[in-house]
Amino acid sequence: MLEIWEDAIQSNAWPFVEAKKILDSLNGKTPEKGYILFETGYGPSGLPHIGTFGENARMVMVQKAFEQLSSIPTKLICFSDDMDGLRKVPSNIPNSEMLAQYMDMPLTSILDPFGEYESYGAYMNAKLRSFLDKFGFEYEFYSSTKCYKAGMFDEMLLKVLEKYDEIMELMLPTFREERKATYSPFMPICPKTGKVLQVPIEKWDAKRGTVTYKDEDNNYIEVPVTGGHCKLQWKPDFGMRWAALKVDYEMYGKDHLANARLYSEICRILGGKPPVQLCYELFLDENGEKISKSKGNSISVDDWLKYAPVESMALFMYQNPTRAKRLFFDVIPQNVDAYITFNQKYHLEEDRAKRFANPVYHIHHGHVPKIETFGITYSLLLNLTSVCNPSDKSVLWGFISKYAPKATPNTTTYLDRLAEFAIRYYDDFIKAHKSYYTPSEKHKVILRDILDMLSSISEETEGEVIQKSIYDIGMKAGYENLRDYFKDLYQILLGQNEGPRLGTFIKLYGIKEMKKLIERKL
């Protein structure tokens, strides 16, 4: 364990950095409950999305890193805020107009518009669990409704009542004057309608364990705060939950950062110890704007998995969680190729600290599969697809088999999947945007020089040799910036502004095929 500790700390990989923070917070002691509790949250008003995957994937990376550094048992819970009242009717579900009658009702008290479960909240919870199970996450599921109604939070809810004034002193300065007049940490559940009420509390009684409010008929209604008769506002709820469940580690998006101090302070007021926390940045679209489900400027998990393996998505989540990242379709090929590079480096590396620093160690929790692509990248396959416009992957395999005779669809399954992904990505994102440049007389001279060079070499010539020869032709052509030279070649030959190392690409595509392509352009 000591050797692993030293190498893990030396690696400076962020999951190990976070795991050490948890250990430091324990002062060398195992918690009284006997385990370390990691918590992720889910708002079941909408379907699980790529952010849900990201938070859970990152959380498990920290959990597994902690398990490498300590023998203290761990547990991960996914907490669903399914007792929240419906504040807005979602537009992207069937029978959405039916939900309008359930405004302010707890999500678990609303009929399922899909007709599959006992409630809308239950439907969304089932989707979450199915989603997490699909990716192999090991977790315990907690329902806010069940926790409140089963009395799991009763002790802490009575403490909130005891500390009512102190909590109000903390919360009120954060609101505008209008909200200050009506705010209370408790939201009673209306005995008549079942709605979650945001009403002023007229009286609170710590001894009786009740709060009193006025209903719409101006009658005073007294309800217990325990047993699911009240729910806390979301900010106090966060801190109360930390105290009640004794959460040791939580991560949340930047949209929570301004309130994190409140969560922690409420946890302390209730006698709890706030968890170690990580605030991760939110995703941006290609224009640098915040991603919004309502705007439709995001990528769904299904979108990503249509074009790339899941580990490439996990790599995107691993990289720099505290830095804002653009999430759009162009990042998919980049992350696939980055994953391939990291995977190859991992298996060549003998230094354990450097292995610990490699993202694939954390993506696969220390059990990294060895993949073989014979030097063929996703980007290279996209460019190959671009010139041969295949109807299915067997066309690509015709070129792959010549380039790497040992590779077959059955033995090189990762590469086979990439070929399939590449065709889908090309069809959906590249094909419609291709724009070929008509070669000028100067370009025709260059193309003839490349054609002569290719005619003078054999099929066995290495890609690097071909690359250098093409480079030399560009130098001879008098380009001040060779990036412009290669850009011209990409536009003429591939119909795009960027492309692969041409030597490697020609080796994969075949010298004979490349000569035919150039002849067509001439």
UniProtKB/Swiss-Prot annotation:
Keywords: Aminoacyl-tRNA synthetase, ATP-binding, Cytoplasm, Ligase, Nucleotide-binding, Protein biosynthesis. Its main location: cytoplasm. GO terms for cellular component: cytoplasm. GO terms for molecular function: ATP binding; lysine-tRNA ligase activity; tRNA binding. It is an enzyme of class 6 (ligase). It catalyses: tRNA(Lys) + L-lysine + ATP = L-lysyl-tRNA(Lys) + AMP + diphosphate. ATP binds at residue 293. A motif ('KMSKS' region) lies at residues 290-294. GO terms for biological process: lysyl-tRNA aminoacylation. Its EC number is 6.1.1.6. InterPro entries: aa-tRNA-synth_I_codon-bd_sub2, aa-tRNA-synth_I_CS, aa_tRNA-synth_I_cd-bd_sf, Lys-tRNA-ligase, Rossmann-like_a/b/a_fold. It is found in: Cytoplasm. A motif ('HIGH' region) lies at residues 44-52. Belongs to the class-I aminoacyl-tRNA synthetase family. This is Lysine--tRNA ligase.
